[in-house]
């Protein structure tokens, strides 16, 4: 709890602000409230917190990097990011330029000037920096920045002698004083003195140049601090003298002549620029850095010289904020351009469209939010996730409302496929949604810092397909496809018949070969008779048994089918225990028909071979009998050989050297899978 003396001090300070009676009553009542005093102390600590200062400096660096200093702080404003040059000057205050009585008179004059400015409607800027106490140490950091103008060395006429002498001009920027400490922990004043890199290179190259640069820095510190410094300065062996929360030089803000042309001259040399009220938030614009104006360096030099001539604020005074609102004159042309652009917009949903009642369509965006399974692309880095054709889970509508401080005046209406937003006399928006949404489960959130309203609407899932559709989809993905009565099906059937005819032709050739073998078997040679007496079966019979076994394995005609292919196919389907498809039934009929034809051809070939053998046997016997009677066993052997040669010359049994015929067997299951 603050004591009585502290309360009296606060009341006295409030009286010095020259407030109205109503404002004074509110302040006195507020400062008597312990809760308000507690909050005020927390605010003061937060403002003076080094972390907060570091965040502010980082924000200014971001603005400078993006090249948006003029957009945020007004025309003619430049942000300077100093870079330590590696030189620190140490000196001490030997005397103050004003006594205590003179300081009181000066403060009184400043107060009168502030009252006059308030009466004239001008902003009230902060007072000048107080004089540095005697004996306090002062550290001046020499820094560089390429945004300042480089030095110039010209010949100028000396007013005293009238002779031409070299004149060195060094454009500079002096930052505000910061409270630091020396090695012993005693309070010390710290300044940042910024020049162009070429100016520092020129000064560091010779002793005279360095002395001139140091004297220039001391002169400006004396003008700002209203004191006298020891000229016997000392250069420290360190890169930079920092303070608490500022290990690096903080960002400085300077004003150029363009600021006065834009109507910001009312801030004067003692005020710091403030952010423009018409720039909502800090949008993310990476890579938007622009080059500084060509006349910025010269204008900065002129501003620095003018500040030095005024004797109260060099360029350091330009780093404090003020509350000037006289920036309306420079915005007339921009407002006209914006109005012209709004007049050319004819789409009500396009941002910037002005409705008949004066409302404007705000900036807005529509996002599709969904879910994806990373397992779909697992193990294949180049596969990716297919996003097309998927219905999103949610629709997100983001609307930027820069002139709205809360969600209270916003009227939001959401339908099944539309969204309407209205802010009376300010904004109006109507959006058609690409998907149906569940308005009862939607949610909205307003970000006061960014002035953005975010509306999240869950998408109504599509209706489930009928039960038969899933089976049809699975059937469409199968390898077997039913063939209809189209022309393509007829062409496929013709191709299958041609392939079957080729197979049948090869089977007929094999049947001729078998008939030859049967004809040869009809004339029993001594070797054949020996094989028969030993009980060995002939080779063709064995081959036929193997073929019958293969036919049984392949699902040939069933017993009792009567040779009907359709009946055989039906019997095969009944044996499998399931109903055959049209394609399977056709394949089974074709296979059964092929086996039936093969069997008929084989039987015909065997009958022909038997008939030929029966016709050749009587003639061979008669010839053999006559030969035996005439010439004995030798002549009989020759007759048997001649008869055998005659049998081989028959047209039915004519064949070349014995060859092995490999006939491909049709596998029904494989053929149906490859169809």
Swiss-Prot record:
Pfam families (alphabetical): PIH1 (PF08190), PIH1_CS (PF18201)
Question: Which InterPro entries does the annotation name?
Answer: Kintoun (IPR034727), PIH1/Kintoun_subfamily (IPR050734), PIH1_N (IPR012981), PIH1D1/2/3_CS-like (IPR041442)
For this UniProt entry, what's an example GO CC term? Answer: cytoplasm
Q: Where in the sequence does UniProt note compositional bias of the Acidic residues kind? A: 544-553
Q: Does the keyword ATP-binding apply?
A: no
Which controlled-vocabulary keywords does the entry list?
Cytoplasm
Keyword Cytoplasm on entry: yes
Function, in words: Required for cytoplasmic pre-assembly of axonemal dyneins, thereby playing a central role in motility in cilia and flagella. Involved in pre-assembly of dynein arm complexes in the cytoplasm before intraflagellar transport loads them for the ciliary compartment.
Instruction: Indicate the family of this protein.
Output: Belongs to the PIH1 family. Kintoun subfamily.
The protein's name: Protein kintoun
What organism is recorded for this protein?
A: Chlamydomonas reinhardtii
């Amino acid at each position: 709890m603050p004591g009585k003396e502290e309360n009296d001090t606060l009341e006295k300070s409030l009286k010095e602000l020259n407030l109205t009676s109503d404002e004074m009553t509110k302040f006195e009542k507020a400062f008597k409230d312990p809760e308000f005093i507690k909050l005020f102390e927390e605010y003061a600590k937060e403002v003076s917190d080094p972390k907060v200062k570091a965040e502010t400096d980082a924000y200014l660096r971001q603005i400078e990097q993006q090249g948006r200093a003029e957009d945020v702080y007004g025309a003619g404003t430049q942000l300077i990011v100093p870079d330590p040059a590696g030189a620190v000057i140490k000196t001490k205050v030997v005397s103050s330029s004003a006594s205590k009585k003179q300081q009181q008179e000066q403060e009184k004059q400043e107060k009168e000037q502030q009252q006059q400015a308030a009466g004239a409607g001008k902003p009230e800027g902060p007072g000048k920096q107080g004089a540095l106490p005697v004996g306090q140490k002062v550290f001046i950091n020499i820094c560089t920045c390429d945004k300042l103008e480089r030095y110039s060395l010209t010949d100028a006429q000396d007013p005293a002698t009238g002779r031409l002498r070299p004149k060195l001009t060094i454009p500079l920027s002096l930052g505000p004083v910061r409270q630091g400490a020396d090695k012993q922990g005693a309070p010390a004043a710290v300044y940042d003195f910024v020049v162009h890199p070429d100016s520092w290179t020129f000064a560091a190259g010779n002793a005279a140049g360095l002395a001139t640069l140091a004297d220039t820095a001391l002169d400006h510190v004396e003008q700002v601090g209203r004191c006298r410094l020891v000229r016997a300065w000392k250069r420290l062996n360190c890169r930079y003298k920092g303070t608490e929360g500022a290990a690096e030089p903080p960002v400085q803000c300077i004003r150029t002549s363009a600021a006065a042309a834009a109507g910001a001259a009312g801030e004067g040399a003692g005020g710091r620029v403030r952010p423009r009220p018409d720039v909502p938030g800090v949008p993310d614009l990476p890579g938007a850095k622009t080059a500084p104006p060509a006349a910025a360096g010269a204008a900065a030099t002129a501003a620095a010289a003018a500040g030095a001539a005024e004797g109260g604020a060099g360029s350091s005074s330009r780093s404090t904020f003020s509350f000037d609102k006289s920036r309306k004159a420079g915005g007339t042309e921009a407002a006209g351009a914006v109005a012209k652009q709004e007049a050319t917009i004819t789409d009500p949903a396009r941002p910037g469209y002005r409705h008949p009642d004066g409302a404007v369509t705000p900036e807005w965006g529509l996002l599709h939010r969904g879910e994806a399974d990373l397992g779909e692309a697992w193990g294949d880095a180049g596969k990716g996730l297919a996003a097309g054709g998927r219905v999103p889970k949610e629709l997100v509508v983001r609307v930027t409302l820069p002139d709205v401080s809360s969600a209270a005046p916003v009227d939001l209406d959401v339908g099944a496929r539309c969204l309407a937003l209205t802010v009376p006399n300010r904004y109006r928006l109507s959006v058609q949604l690409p998907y149906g949404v569940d308005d009862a489960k939607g949610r909205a959130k307003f970000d006061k810092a960014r002035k953005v309203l975010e509306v999240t609407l869950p998408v109504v899932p599509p209706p489930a397909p009928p039960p038969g559709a899933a089976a049809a989809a699975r059937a469409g993905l199968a390898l077997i496809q039913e063939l209809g009565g189209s022309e393509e099906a007829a062409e496929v059937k013709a191709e299958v018949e041609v392939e079957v005819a080729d197979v049948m032709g090869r089977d007929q050739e094999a049947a001729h070969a078998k008939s030859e073998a049967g004809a040869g078997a009809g004339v029993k040679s001594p070797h054949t008779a020996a094989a028969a007496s030993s009980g060995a079966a002939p080779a063709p019979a064995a081959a036929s048994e193997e073929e019958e076994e293969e036919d049984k394995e392949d699902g040939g005609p069933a017993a009792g089918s009567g040779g009907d292919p359709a009946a055989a196919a039906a019997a095969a389907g009944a044996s499998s225990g399931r109903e055959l498809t049209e394609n399977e039934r056709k394949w089974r009929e074709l296979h059964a028909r092929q086996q039936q034809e093969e069997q008929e051809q084989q039987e015909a070939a065997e009958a022909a071979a038997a008939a030929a053998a029966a016709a050749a046997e009587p003639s061979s016997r008669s010839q053999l009998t006559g030969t035996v009677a005439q010439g004995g066993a030798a002549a009989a052997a020759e007759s048997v050989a001649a008869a055998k040669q005659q049998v081989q010359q028959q047209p039915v049994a004519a064949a070349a050297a014995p060859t092995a015929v490999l006939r491909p067997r049709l596998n029904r299951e494989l053929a149906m899978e490859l169809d």
